[in-house]
Amino acid sequence: MGNMDVMKIENLTKQYKGFRLDNVSLRIKPGEIVGLVGENGAGKSTLMKAALGLIRSDAGQVLFWGQPLQQNSVEIKNKIGVMLDESGFYHTMNAQEAGKICAGIYKDWDSAKYETFLNKYGINMKKPIKDYSKGMRVKLMLATALCHGAEILILDEPTSGLDPVAREEILEDFKEFVSDGKKAVLISLHISSDLEKIADEIVFIHQGRQVFTKSSREICEEGGVDMIMNEYVRGKSI
């Protein structure tokens, strides 16, 4: 697929009563990690869900490798790893059973890689998911997202509930994921310093509107994500 954008969002809009995701555009090239920042309720999760077709958008277009998700849907969906929360499996299951379900869904499921990630993350394959900590459930969802041949990961707060050591480990996994220059990641993180470490570009969304898209280098030179966001919210120009 050469240098074609892995994902391209053009003028995506979603209207709810009392909230509007307004005309958001971004593009993710092979080898890139693009981060979303903004206050709770800014529209980051809405953007991800609309991009994936989980909710219907009111306007705009989303392309994966130049194609709408509706075309060749199964083929494209097999190449997308998604984590929007940590509750993707029935909590009465264990990790081994979750892996068997994934093997039946994804044609490129890698059982050996899955077991490697479970061991790396310290996940007991036989322990019921209902007995996991929140951090362990997050790690399980990440393991499944990383093991089915995905070429783009779309991740909403994937490090939520993790201790600093586990966060660092998983951030390194994301960088490793894109290191071949072919894959990509769209990610939101509540700890902006983590995003500055791994993202190539950062998109700031405030009250449903896209304020800017800038490189991490630019943002760090201007004082960091938190400083820029706070100045904007206080009414200063970006």
Where are these regions (language model features)?
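Conserved beta-strand
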Residues: I9-L12, F19-K29, G60
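The feature captures the beta-strand-to-loop junction immediately N-terminal to the Walker
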Residues: V37-E39
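Helix-to-loop junction immediately C-terminal to a conserved catalytic motif
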Residues: L52
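Conserved ABC transporter NBD signature motif
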Residues: G60-Q71, E75-I76
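ABC-family P-loop ATPase nucleotide-binding domains
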Residues: L84-L140
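Catalytic Walker B motif of ABC-type/P-loop ATPase nucleotide-binding domains
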Residues: L153-E157
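Helix N-cap at the start of a conserved alpha-helix in ABC-type nucleotide-binding domains
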Residues: P164-A166
